[in-house]
Amino acid sequence: MSESAPVGRSCPTQKPIATSVILAYNRLHNAIRTARMCRVRKGSGMAKLVFGMNQSLDGYVDHMAFAPSTTLFRHFIEEAQGQAGSVYGRRMYEVMRYWDDDHPEWDAEEHAFATAWRNQPKWVVSRWSKSIGPNASLVEDDLEGAIRELKAKRDGEIEVAGPDLARSLTELGLIDEYRIYLHPVVLGHGKPYFAGPRPPLRLMTTDRIGEDVIRLTYVPA
């Protein structure tokens, strides 16, 4: 007669196996859900508006506080190369114009990012800015109409840059995806990722980028 495990205890191998099965199922479920979303978007013939920024553990964004690792910077280069364009508020656009001019201290990857950024069409939402750089257009009036037309006429992914602009577009129901690049840093103060009330969201995927950054991808619920 063979011995059996005591009542109330499972065999030592059952828990790891069960955990592996659950993790595998979750990964498969996320992959299927993401694939379905991609098929719908591909068939819609409309651009996808994406808001992504680096964020601290306590919810703040500050481009001066997050020096990207080599892996993360390469990721941003690939993102910029693949995007159909970017929509900026005035202040964020002025910050990003740093990439319009070459700098002698740049390495090859910084040159690669600058090239990708310059090649992108850019739309600057501002009633006051009259000076814009190459490959950029002003959006001065009717933000909702302009962005809806932009999404209808373009294919691919269009980046939204800056939490204030993202707040306005969120309130209009125009952002299709939110990407939070979560860093193991606590700032204690600053500009929050969500400049207004957080909209209802559904988590779609999580990715680890490099050693210490987790990307959380959400869509409107």
Model-derived regions: residue spans:
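Low-acidity, Ser/Thr- and Arg-rich intrinsically disordered low-complexity segments
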Residues: 2-4, 9-11, 20
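Enzymes that bind and transform nitrogen-containing heteroaromatic metabolites
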Residues: 22-221
